[in-house]
């Protein structure tokens, strides 16, 4: 969370940057602008690829998994991975299976944005051909030549819980980022409603893996060139599934809603994002909430 005192925020940012530099010393990390440029080049090439990032709660769960040999996850870890990322049930067998899948998927990415969360540093030691970049490379509105401009004329699939709002906002795309080529006109837009298990919400599925399989099935039935994914802990595996079935995939995770001009509490006071807000931006449709949204970082996406 950003500090209200600008000097304290500046000091915190400096310290965070210093820790990142020391911890990732020796890792070749592209600056955010260069990562954005590479993503745009990959999109223009038409080749399958995965550009994503590791989730914070997911990487803390992986840290527990690495430390305890796949069992004895802490109560805090079980609660957070359920409420903040939507993984269920949270027994040892499920979390062990989840961590194995998540690590394997992260290590297979063509481009991975790093931001020093949980076991991320340990996980990337297993990357063979992955290129790394700074986190803001994933968010196109930060850049003069946004990677998202390369979505023009492409068949785009979005996997996200806010299906209704995204479809409505896309129709207002020219109003969302005036003067910037952030959200161009696609050849087509398909939105798959992501399963929402955040905050302990009942999903109607027996397990996280059952829900994952169903969303993969829906993706396979869609006609698309590029997938943009923001679906909690499902995001990285779903993006990898898109890549593995011959598509380009970018895992924007929580920031996906910003691409479509959808406000969220976590950005209301953000020094950059809040200034992008304009009268065309909206909150998620009231039908797209969850019963316990306050459990999700205080309702940060609504």
Question: How should these model regions be labeled?
Answer:
Residues 52, 192, 252:
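Hydrophobic residues at beta-strand termini and immediately following loops
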Residues 148, 155-204, 277-279, 283-302:
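Mobile, glycine- and charge-enriched loop segments
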Residues 237-302:
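C-terminal functional extensions of proteins
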């Amino acid at each position: 969370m950003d500090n209200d005192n600008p000097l304290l925020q500046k000091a915190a940012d400096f310290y965070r940057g210093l820790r990142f530099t020391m911890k990732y010393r020796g890792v070749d990390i592209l600056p955010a602008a260069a990562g954005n440029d590479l993503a745009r080049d990959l999109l223009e090439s038409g080749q399958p690829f995965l550009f994503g990032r590791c989730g914070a709660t997911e990487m803390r769960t992986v840290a527990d998994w690495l430390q305890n040999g796949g069992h004895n996850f802490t109560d805090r870890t079980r609660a957070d991975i359920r409420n903040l990322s939507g993984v269920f049930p949270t027994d040892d067998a499920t979390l062990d299976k989840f961590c194995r899948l998540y690590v394997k998927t992260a290590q297979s990415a063509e481009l991975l944005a790093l931001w020093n969360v949980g076991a991320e540093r340990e996980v990337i030691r297993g990357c063979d051909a992955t290129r790394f970049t700074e986190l803001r490379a994933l968010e196109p509105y930060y850049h003069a030549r946004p990677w998202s401009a390369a979505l023009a004329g492409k068949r785009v699939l979005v996997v996200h819980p806010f299906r209704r709002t995204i479809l409505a906002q896309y129709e207002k795309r020219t109003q969302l980022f005036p003067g910037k080529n952030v959200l161009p006109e696609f050849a087509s837009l398909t939105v798959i409603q992501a399963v929402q298990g955040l905050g302990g919400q009942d999903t109607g599925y027996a397990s996280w893996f059952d829900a994952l399989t169903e969303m993969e099935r829906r993706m396979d039935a869609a006609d698309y060139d590029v997938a943009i994914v923001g679906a909690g802990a499902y995001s990285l595996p779903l993006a990898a599934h898109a890549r593995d079935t011959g598509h380009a995939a970018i895992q924007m995770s929580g920031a996906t809603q910003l691409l479509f001009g959808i406000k969220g509490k976590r950005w209301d006071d953000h020094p950059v994002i809040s200034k992008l807000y304009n009268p065309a931006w909206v909150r998620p449709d009231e039908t797209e909430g969850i019963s316990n949204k306050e459990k999700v970082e205080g309702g940060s996406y609504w």
